[in-house]
A protein has these predicted regions:
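Signal-transducing coiled-coil/dimerization helices and immediately adjacent hinge/linker segments
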Residues: 540-604
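PAS/PAS-like sensory domain cap-loop motif
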Residues: 458-469
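Sensory modules in modular signal-transduction proteins
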Residues: 426-459
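PAS-family sensory/regulatory modules and their coupling/dimerization elements
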Residues: 480-530
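Iron-sulfur cluster-binding cysteine motifs and their immediate structural context
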Residues: 3-5, 12, 16-42, 47-67, ...
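Sensory coupling linkers of modular signal transduction proteins
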Residues: 514-559
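Iron-sulfur-associated redox domains of electron-transfer enzymes in respiratory
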Residues: 63-361, 365-367, 371-380, 400-408
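PAS-family sensory/regulatory domains
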Residues: 467-483
Length: 604
């Protein structure tokens, strides 16, 4: 159905929904990219008690809204009626019952009646069946209990009264008056959304919305019921049946005693209690005649879809009881006819027509493949559980035992890393690996500037034991008090501050960071003494190398100068000789010209 939706951004894998789910219908899956665990309701296993919605601390779970469909239904149909659960009195602490009815009329409903009208017929039918039965009869008004029995304890189906819930009975009554009428049930129950889809019940109620949805709808329409005048129901006003949303309400309405000391009747509320009772019923003596079971502790007044501002369970119960006390006054002022609470009397019950209350059930037992012991051991080993004493069975993951969680892992419902003690140990071991395995010294300094802890590398750097340093002031060893105050008071960070520790013959780099949540500072000390020594040695080598290089350069310059001098002398001598030679050659040329005569033409 995709009825329960999960906002993955808000789901913080706290496992509270899983811890609160009696049938463990929560599937833990990893998100595609972040790989973080996220909870998803497996509706094929869910009995729809809705506790996971109410218990989620991040409000990450919600119900698929149905009121838009109801609004559309009203828009095209002028005969849409409300069947209003009697728990409405407890749902809206700031409203009078008549104001709730006025608010509903503002939404466009053609008529409003109390579901409790049909509850009296349902209660009488249960009494009649119980009195004729040889074994205990389980009430069937709570759809979550019906789901529990059909899916997990089907052997109890013969004991489940074949009677529809007051919601279905009331819808059938309303549609008997007008076959084309549409019926919308409004209440605090999640399982009602599913009940109207069960075989044999699909033609009765057209839509279900919760009190939470009703508030949202009012807000969208700009309706403030607290500003409206009281209105009345359109139909009979039941009396005892207004107690139906309380544990023991059905038995009381049936004219039986809900006394806890009676062995004829028994009231069990809370899905855990109901589950335990049904499983252990065979060993019970004596067996009660009629067992009223309600999935919500204390009854429907504590349903998962009650408004958040509807007070505590005790206040809700008291409002229902007060409403019952004031019922005679309501009847006097109400224009609708009064409904006598005589349906449970033997005379009326004997002749009442219960055919329209009949229903059947189906065996929907959840069948899971049970893994072998070897497979279970392999999963347990993933979280370092190799022997029974390693299994803490703490329940932090949501399962009752480590073995139960291992089975869930094999069935695809859980993840090995859901084991909180294992993950804590793993995280601590990784932290210890970083803390104790790093070559740098790490000091944990408190706000009083005293050393709280240190790792073995710090012992090596400071040349003393942990016991000698813990409790002493950090300023005695490594960091000035003024620097620490900057870290604690101004939340500053000191990064790679170089300090000399002459008494230890060390040169270190100091980094100080604040762990504000723990109110401590981490002083990280990196020993760079050997590095600085290497740098000094390298500097010396560089100096010597530069000197040698300069000597070579000087020698090369001297040689070059000598060579240049010699070349200069040789060049000068060569120049003199060549000059003389050129002069001689010139003189010889002039002599040869005079002997041969003048070759130029004579002038005229």
């Amino acid at each position: 159905m995709d009825l329960i939706r999960v906002n993955e951004a808000h789901c913080r894998d706290c496992y509270k929904c899983l811890r609160s789910c009696p049938v463990k219908a929560i599937r833990m899956e990893r998100a595609p990219f972040s790989q973080q665990l996220r909870a998803r309701v497996d509706e094929s296993r869910c009995v729809l008690d809705g506790r996971c919605i109410a218990e989620c601390p991040q409000k990450a779970k919600s119900v698929r809204p149905a009121y838009p469909s109801v609004r559309s239904l009203i828009a095209v149909n002028d005969d849409v009626w409300v069947s209003l659960a009697p728990s409405f009195v407890a749902a809206f602490a700031h409203l009078r019952p008549g104001q709730v009815l006025a608010g509903l009329r503002k939404l466009g409903f053609a008529g409003i009646r109390e579901t409790a009208v049909a509850a009296e017929w349902v209660a009488a039918a249960h009494r009649k069946i119980a009195e004729k039965s040889q074994g205990p009869v389980m009430t069937s008004s709570c759809p979550a209990i019906v789901n529990l029995i059909e899916m997990y304890i089907p052997e109890m189906l013969p004991n489940l009264a074949p009677i529809v819930s007051p919601m279905i009975a009331h819808a059938r009554m309303l549609k008997k008056e007008a076959p084309c009428r549409k019926v919308v049930f409004i209440g605090p129950c999640l399982a009602k959304y599913d009940e109207i889809t069960r075989p044999g019940l699909t033609q009765d109620v057209d839509q279900v919305i919760s009190f939470v949805e009703l508030e949202t709808w009012w807000a969208e329409e700009g309706i403030d019921p607290s500003q409206l005048e009281d209105e009345y129901f359109d139909g009979p006003a039941p009396l005892e049946a207004v107690l139906f949303p309380l544990d023991g309400g059905l038995i009381k309405t049936a004219g039986l005693t809900p006394d806890m000391l009676s062995n004829r009747t028994l009231t069990v509320s809370g899905l855990d209690n109901c589950q335990d009772f049904l499983i252990n019923l065979a060993a019970s003596e004596p067996v009660p005649m009629l067992v009223e079971m309600m999935a919500c502790p204390g009854g429907c007044i504590n349903g998962p879809l009650m408004p958040a501002d509807s007070d505590d369970a005790f206040a809700r119960r008291m409002r229902i009881l007060k409403y019952r006390e004031e019922r005679p006054n309501y009847r006097e002022n109400c224009p609708c006819p009064a409904m006598e609470n005589s349906l449970a009397d033997d005379a009326r019950a004997e002749h009442a027509d219960y055919e329209f209350l009949q229903r059947t059930y189906e065996n929907r037992q959840i069948i899971s493949v049970e893994p072998t012991e070897e497979q279970i051991k392999e999963v347990l080993a993933m979280t370092s559980k190799y022997a029974p004493e390693d299994e803490l069975n703490c329940g932090a993951c949501g399962y009752n035992s480590c073995k139960e969680k291992a089975i869930a892992v094999l069935q695809g419902m859980a993840d090995p890393e859901m084991c909180i003690p294992y993950m804590r140990t793993k995280a601590e071991s990784m932290s210890n690996l970083v803390f104790f395995g790093t070559p740098n010294g790490v000091l944990v300094v408190g706000s009083d500037e005293r050393i709280l802890d240190m790792n073995s590398s710090a012992e090596r750097i400071f040349g003393t034991s942990r016991n000698h340093l813990v409790g002493t002031l950090a300023s005695q060893w490594i960091i000035d008090s003024s620097d620490l105050r900057r870290v604690f008071e101004d939340n500053e960070e000191i990064v790679r501050l170089e300090k000399e520790l002459p008494e230890l013959g060390l040169i270190v780099l100091v980094t100080v960071v604040s762990a504000k949540k723990e109110n401590v500072a981490l002083v990280i000390v990196e020993d760079i003494t050997s590095q600085r020594q290497r740098e000094t040695e390298l500097q010396l080598v560089r100096g010597v190398t530069l000197e040698r290089a300069q000597e070579v350069i000087d020698k090369q310059m001297a040689v070059a100068q000598k060579i240049a001098g010699l070349l200069g002398e040789t060049t000068a001598e060569t120049k003199v000789i060549l000059t003389k030679l050129m002069r001689v050659m010139k003189e010889e040329g002039n002599t040869d010209g005079a002997v041969s005569g003048d070759w130029r033409r004579p002038t005229e």
